[in-house]
């Protein structure tokens, strides 16, 4: 009886290392396809000898593919598990593998983009920038090391998880489990960003409303900013943040928003209604 072909930790680790170069051959014809095939080579070499089956496997992973680059890891793992079953004649064929990839890349992208691009990266960048603004070199280092620690952990453990779970991973994507995870991460990110906006954003309107001289002869000057702070501290930074968020939702180019803020700030200081 022929011995079953099994992937070892060596092939899994090699796939993990290669996954860091997924976008090295990014192109607009097949997007991540060449990188995907490159990652799968250690598993394919282990499971298939030289010949038609190996060639078919390589061609299978040159098909169009695009999803979140960090969360390709569990898809790599599932693909490796299915290729292993196919190599051992367990009833899996090439169409099933391709179908699985197509079926997972959409939901995975829907999870990865809001969690990593929309939450983790901005929050870490904000924390690093807050330290950097104070002249602390730990700011950029904190951002770099924490972000890459999360990236590498996601790739490594995601790959192992996908390989161990195989097609059972589809059950984890079912229901509203992923939706709850995404919503929770988004709420956490908004909470942190809200706190940082209050700390960073400074808007001062120095227009004088009144001058009152007390009994000692001291003049108490009230400005628009003093009045606003007495009603609701941080109202202007909050309003600016909500305005920018609304403009982004309406599809306004972020570069135009940034330039607009610069122009208003410079003109406001020159005209004397901002300080």
From Swiss-Prot:
PROSITE patterns: PTS_EIID (PS51108). Disulfide bonds: none annotated. GO terms for biological process: phosphoenolpyruvate-dependent sugar phosphotransferase system. It comes from the Bacteria. This is Fructose permease IID component. The phosphoenolpyruvate-dependent sugar phosphotransferase system (PTS), a major carbohydrate active -transport system, catalyzes the phosphorylation of incoming sugar substrates concomitant with their translocation across the cell membrane. This system is involved in fructose transport. One of its GO terms (cellular component) is plasma membrane. Its main location: membrane. InterPro entries: GatZ_KbaZ_carbometab (IPR050303), PTS_IID_man (IPR004704). It comes from Bacillus subtilis (strain 168). The EIID domain, with its homologous EIIC domain, forms the PTS system translocation channel and contains part of its specific substrate-binding site. Keywords: Cell membrane, Membrane, Phosphotransferase system, Sugar transport, Transmembrane, Transmembrane helix, Transport. It is a multi-pass membrane protein. It is found in: Cell membrane. Residues 5-274 form the PTS EIID domain. The chain crosses the membrane at residues 100-120, 127-147, 187-207, 227-247, 255-275. Signal peptide: none annotated.
């Amino acid at each position: 009886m022929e011995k079953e072909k099994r992937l070892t930790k060596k092939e899994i680790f090699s796939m993990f290392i290669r996954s860091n170069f997924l976008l090295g051959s990014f192109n607009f014809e097949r997007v991540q396809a060449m990188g995907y095939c490159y990652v799968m080579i250690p598993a394919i070499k282990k499971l298939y000898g030289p010949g038609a089956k190996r060639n078919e496997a390589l061609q299978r992973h040159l098909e169009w593919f695009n999803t979140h680059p960090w969360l390709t890891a569990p898809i790599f793992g599932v693909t490796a598990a299915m290729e292993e079953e196919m190599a051992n004649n367990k009833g899996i064929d090439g169409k099933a593998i391709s179908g699985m990839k197509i079926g997972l890349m959409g939901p995975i992208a829907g999870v990865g983009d809001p969690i990593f691009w929309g939450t983790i990266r901005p929050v870490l960048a904000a924390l690093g920038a807050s330290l950097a603004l104070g002249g602390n070199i730990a700011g950029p280092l904190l951002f770099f090391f924490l972000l890459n620690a999360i990236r590498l952990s996601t790739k490594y453990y995601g790959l192992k998880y996908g390989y161990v779970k195989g097609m059972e991973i589809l059950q984890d994507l079912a229901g509203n489990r992923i939706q709850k995870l995404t919503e929770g991460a988004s709420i956490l990110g908004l909470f942190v960003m809200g706190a940082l906006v209050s700390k960073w954003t400074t808007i001062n309107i120095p227009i004088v409303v009144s001058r009152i001289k007390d009994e000692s002869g001291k003049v108490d000057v009230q400005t628009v900013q003093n009045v606003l702070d007495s009603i609701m501290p941080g109202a202007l930074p909050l309003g600016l943040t909500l305005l920018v968020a609304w403009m982004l939702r309406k599809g306004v180019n972020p570069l135009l928003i940034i330039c607009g803020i610069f122009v208003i700030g410079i003109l406001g200081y020159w005209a004397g209604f901002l300080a």
